[in-house]
């Protein structure tokens, strides 16, 4: 069965289209009007091993918040839909990823229970047109709409670009492990029988 999803989200603030294939090859393309955020979404696809297409038109004349938030919500929804009943998945994943001086640890549980723990040094500023304070909100939005538990911990880093990018790469690698199919898992990996 194909583990894919196509999610379209329309509000008065944005129009988002996400296409996701969990069993892809890491082909990723993002066009949101926020170049650094495009780069981050492409990191999720590439390092998650997902085929991912992101197309967002948002009210950038105000700022990037709605565009970024709605894209994250739609991505989380696509992740949840592509996982289906979660039969045969590994469920858990973790990764520690360096990017020069930055080091980030992420862990994910595809539990069906949304919970986000995000620990980073206070980063207030812009990377291009990307507001660094949105990073936590992106992961909170993905977590809520995907219904997953996600921990992201920045262990070190000074350069804002490196700190944010290492977070996306680390989350992607953790998700890659969690969504992977495991031939030893019969059914859903939970003693409850459902995730």
Swiss-Prot record:
On whether Cytoplasm is a keyword of this UniProt record, the answer is: yes
Reaction catalyzed: D-erythro-1-(imidazol-4-yl)glycerol 3-phosphate = 3-(imidazol-4-yl)-2-oxopropyl phosphate + H2O
The reply to whether Lipid biosynthesis figures as a keyword in the UniProt entry is no
Quote the PROSITE patterns the UniProt record gives.
Answer: IGP_DEHYDRATASE_1, IGP_DEHYDRATASE_2
Q: Which GO terms describe its biological process?
A: L-histidine biosynthetic process
Q: What is its main location?
A: cytoplasm
- A Pfam family this protein belongs to? IGPD
Question: What keywords are annotated for this sequence in UniProt?
Answer: Amino-acid biosynthesis, Cytoplasm, Histidine biosynthesis, Lyase
Name this protein carries in UniProt:
Imidazoleglycerol-phosphate dehydratase
Tell me what organism the protein belongs to.
Parafrankia sp. (strain EAN1pec)
Task: Identify the gene encoding this protein.
Answer: hisB
């Amino acid at each position: 069965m194909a583990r894919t999803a196509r999610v379209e989200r329309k509000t008065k603030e944005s129009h988002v289209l996400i296409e996701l294939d969990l069993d892809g090859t890491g082909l990723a393309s993002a066009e949101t009007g926020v170049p650094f955020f495009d780069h981050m979404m492409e990191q999720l696809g590439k390092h998650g091993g997902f085929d991912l297409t992101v197309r967002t038109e948002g009210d950038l004349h105000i700022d990037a918040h709605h565009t970024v938030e709605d894209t994250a919500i739609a991505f989380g929804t696509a992740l949840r839909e592509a996982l289906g009943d979660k039969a045969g998945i590994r469920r858990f994943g973790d990764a520690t990823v360096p990017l020069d001086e930055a080091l980030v640890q992420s862990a994910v549980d595809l539990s069906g229970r949304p919970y986000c723990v995000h620990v980073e040094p206070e980063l207030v500023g812009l990377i291009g047109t990307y507001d660094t304070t949105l990073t936590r909100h992106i992961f909170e939005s993905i977590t809520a709409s995907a219904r997953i538990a996600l921990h992201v911990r920045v262990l070190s880093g000074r350069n804002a670009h490196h700190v944010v990018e290492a977070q996306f790469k680390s989350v992607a690698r953790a998700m890659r492990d969690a969504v992977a199919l495991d031939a030893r898992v019969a059914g859903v990996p939970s003693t409850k029988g459902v995730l």
